[in-house]
A protein has these predicted regions:
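Residue-level signal for alpha-helical transmembrane segments in multi-pass membrane proteins
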Residues: 12-19
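N-terminal targeting signals for export/organelle localization
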Residues: 10-11, 75
Length: 300
């Protein structure tokens, strides 16, 4: 009995060790970019037409409908939408070089984390946390022996409208709280901010610490309708030439409700909407005009 009682406290202490470490004892591993965005739909067939036919991405095996943008980025659709009032965004995931170390790092910074990092359906290591506004944010470490690793270089058809998700965005109500999480703890940095007027801040681009993808805070949004949430909670696909991308969509008879335009950030963009109103923004990565409101940091 004595031995059993003496061992249990030691085992408990070992299990809790990551959470008890001082902040400086665990270094943040690299966070290199957007890994995936997961969305709700109530019509997988319509989603497949939009992401597979109109946008030209290849569907790969997985739950729901999974579309491959490149070897490190995916768009996932799940038939979970039960009401038009629901938010379509399930989560956004970022790629890290070490999921376990990142989990321990977040625990050391008093972020609630799962008990352990686990392999997901695709064989990669991943875990999720909640940001200060309750949004699910995931982190993925790609493994060479996973389903995605074994499919490296495959399912990348010439029909794809884009080769990269360059950013995702969602509604932010409390910028200071979100900054404490994304900037102060995770290491994201402001790349550009702009607004509908020169002195307003309606959009804030926060670049990942070890890459060029970014998160766009969508600020000053009050009581959004389902359509407004779809506009704000969005993803952006980089295209090298907007005119060519627009023509490809026309040739595929895609539903186009808007025309290409130059945004406040000086970049060509074209807004598309999937069957459940989530905005998919096509964007040329480089400004063709001087961005409004603030200087834009150049790519790393």
């Amino acid at each position: 009995m004595f031995r059993r009682r003496s061992i249990l406290p030691a085992l408990l202490a070992a299990a809790l060790a990551p959470a008890l470490l001082p902040q400086s004892a665990v270094q943040r591993p690299a966070i290199t970019g957007v890994a995936r965005i997961a969305l709700k739909t109530n019509d997988l067939a319509a989603a497949r037409r939009f992401y597979g036919h109109d946008l030209g991405f290849a569907e790969v095996p997985g739950p729901g409908a999974v579309f491959k943008v490149n070897d490190h980025q995916y768009i996932e659709l799940y038939p979970q939408l039960k009401s038009e009032d629901e938010d379509r965004l399930i989560n956004v995931a970022y790629e890290t070089t070490d999921a376990k170390q990142l989990r321990d790092y977040l625990a050391a910074h008093s972020i609630e984390v799962p008990a352990a990092v686990a392999k997901q359906w695709d064989g990669n290591l991943a875990f999720s946390v909640k940001d200060p506004e309750g949004r699910e944010i995931a982190f993925v470490q790609y493994l060479s022996d996973s389903q995605t690793g074994r499919q490296s270089g495959k399912s990348l058809p010439a029909t794809a409208i884009s080769a990269r998700i360059i950013h995702t965005g969602f509604i932010v109500q409390d910028r200071a709280a979100e900054d404490r999480f994304y900037r102060d703890i995770l290491g994201f940095e402001e790349m550009w901010h702009g607004g509908k007027t020169e002195d307003s801040v309606d959009w804030l681009d926060m670049r990942v610490p070890d890459g060029n993808d970014w998160l766009e805070y969508m600020l000053n949004v009050r009581n959004p309708t389902p359509k407004t949430r779809g506009v704000m909670n969005h993803l952006a696909l980089g295209v090298p030439n907007m005119e060519a991308a627009n023509q490809r969509l026309i040739d595929r008879a895609a539903t186009l409700t808007e025309k290409p335009k130059i945004g406040r950030d000086g970049k060509w963009q074209l807004n598309l909407y999937d069957p459940n109103l989530t905005r998919v923004e096509l964007m040329e990565p480089k400004p063709v005009q001087t961005p409004c409101c603030s200087p834009m940091k150049p790519p790393r």
